């Protein structure tokens, strides 16, 4: 279908809100983003990393999804059957914490509601926030196939989760056992490592005496957590530490509790650290747990799940753990067993959701046995069907982690999530694990715990495609997926788990490539956080500058694997770029004279400028396509920017005005054809980055098809590449630029004619200039041009050197020297004042000591800038005085 637009439908000013209004809904109505599932077309699929249904998406999500959308839009235009699958994560503790906080406002706890009612309330939250997330996806312009939207708790994915759990259990790869886990005493649940935020806390090292049972002395131990002392079951020393050789095998009388504990030898102990003697608390420290296993030590839990001390803590039973810490230290002092207290800055884990200090805690949990699964996944990386990490260095990061993996704690003491499909017989205690409920259900009690959120999201690439139904059309057609886009911070928690689960259950890699990006940081390189107050809401950016500005800024602001420094100045710069495109497009449209798509005719292209812009267009098509395949979107952005801003807008459009405003109708029509053809192709190249504005411009241009979203990706036309014209145009551009720079230096407008003398280095350069003299006349405005090997610069000439020539412009005919010197001396006075002012500040010790570093740095930059400007003006004055 060909749609023609004879009237210009583009307002004078680029207003992103107007341009973006209505387009997304139209795209959805027309089902442009709906994958066909057509086996005749080559498939291309990306599954969105499912955001948590907990609220607003942040700038990291915007970056992540923009990259995915760029890839899928590009592939759709290249003719692939493209699926960009949306979905959301139930997010376990994150969502439950939000819902509990909301209930708390009404003085209601989840226990007041009961499990079933609380889960119903959480589903209501999910529905509300899922809609909010979809609105944000719409604002960003993501080309998602909503007919395939999934949720980690929907029926299909729940079936997949049960299947995986039961299969792994039956293989002996899921087991129930005691282990040290991260425990949140406020939420009363285990936490994954990613849910623990480490903060540097100013604490204390307490040095204490542990008396030997035989009364012959004591060992000095140091701890940051005295509250765990009631759980000590040994003191460890290094087996080769000569200081303690005679004590190994003897016992300590644990103070206060008066429990006899052994002195054991273990290489875990660092001889040089502290006294070289370490208290061992197997139930409250992961390293101590391992030491305890090696020495068959008892494990004594001394806290309740809420962080208060329990009956094993003796007299401290019922106290909050931090109150107990103070009382234990006081008791050591009273017993004369306190040596000293030293300040100690150390990293302390806090719950990401509740803020509570995380307790290493021995708990009965469900685990995945990771070693065999990791080995299988690592074997995949030795085959041609490996997952390709982009950049490749992250493969080593992944492999190192998999080589050193620990068993994965998958149970969580929550109500919101996939309930563990395990039941315990009320009388016999027998365990039943199955995809379906046991018979005689009333005789069984289901496990109260739910699965770690990452358990279901690890199945995301294949569960969303219909697995465990391996005959599902989407599973057959779109799996394995093509590209996963994600941050380097979750390679361990998500990427690795998707790989081993996919290998185990499908025999395939989950995705062919994984594009790893960094973190979004502020303009100073700091991580965005609430405490710094430097977070940015992407929707606010869109409301001010438009989605296209934000998308292009995010996509082109970094290389794969690198962090992105975000600033409003960069977004504003992109907005200016789009405004330039808008204005150039309006100029083109106003000069097409109602041209229809089938009237575009490039058969009469003879002008060097026309051949040059078509050559540059094809070079740009080739570069953008090639760089896009390698995910080098920063380079794609620079390539497009240079072509559009420099080549097309600054040069070709200016050159095109000559035939457009002339009398030659054939030349006019050819120029219109080149303008329409080039702008149409350029909009298609730019479309994945800026979907809204490119659709608007493309619809106004002569075009073929219903929407740019499904228009054909531009292909290189070898017949349009003319290197001779490219060389000629490069020659003309450098000469014209040099002349313009000289005019600027001596403050002479283009309207004033000049005498121009050019001394070429060789015949080829000379011929190019002579054959294209009209360009020099049009853009340099000379009253006289001399192109000769014999010309030499006069004493009064301004000169410039370009790659193939020397350029001379005699000054006496150009300016009134006395007037120009007077003007420059006035400017010099201005810069002298600015230099004096800024140096006055920088020489003021009070300013230097009290002003923030960033302010001082800014003043130093000003000083350099003002000194440079002063030197430049002085140099120009001296040059003119010599004349």
Curated annotation (Swiss-Prot):
It holds the Pfam family Val_tRNA-synt_C. A motif ('KMSKS' region) lies at residues 527-531. It comes from the Bacteria. It is found in: Cytoplasm. It is an enzyme of class 6 (ligase). CDD domains: Anticodon_Ia_Val, ValRS_core. GO terms for molecular function: aminoacyl-tRNA deacylase activity; ATP binding; valine-tRNA ligase activity. The keyword Nucleotide-binding applies. ATP binds at residue 530. GO terms for biological process: valyl-tRNA aminoacylation. Belongs to the class-I aminoacyl-tRNA synthetase family. ValS type 1 subfamily. Monomer. HAMAP family: Val_tRNA_synth_type1 (MF_02004). This is Valine--tRNA ligase. It comes from Listeria monocytogenes serovar 1/2a (strain ATCC BAA-679 / EGD-e). The lineage of its organism: Bacteria, Bacillati, Bacillota, Bacilli, Bacillales. The gene is valS.
